[in-house]
Amino acid sequence: MTTIGPIENEIKELLTKELNPINLEIINESYMHNVPKGSESHFKVKIVSEKFETLSMIEQHRLVNEILKNFIGNGKIHALSITSRTPTQWKKNNQTKINVDDDKSPSCKGGFGK
């Protein structure tokens, strides 16, 4: 079992407070990159919220980015991948979780000495 770090925990708190998600998955993908062990720099967010119902996908992503701007702007988060759904879209696919395999992140291609 992985430990939830302070940045991941704060991301969860902010998104929960602002978007009241039906489903929220936050995946720390930092281990896939050339960063020190235990880093919290690369995240994938999968979120289902009623607040997305009238928004296009790009507007949904902009909203998530706006909520997390203090992490992105100050360099706490180096990379953020977002998968967002409305409850209607989520129920249409009969899902209880957003499938992790639907949008696998690529392996790190850069970094120090790679």
From Swiss-Prot:
Lineage top rank: taxon: Eukaryota
Region (Disordered): 88-114
Biased composition (Polar residues): 88-98
Annotated Pfam families: BolA
GO cellular component: mitochondrion
InterPro entries linked to this entry: BolA, BolA-like_sf, BolA/IbaG_stress_morph_reg
Similarity comment: family membership: Belongs to the BolA/IbaG family.
Protein name per UniProt: BolA-like protein DDB_G0274169
Organism: Dictyostelium discoideum
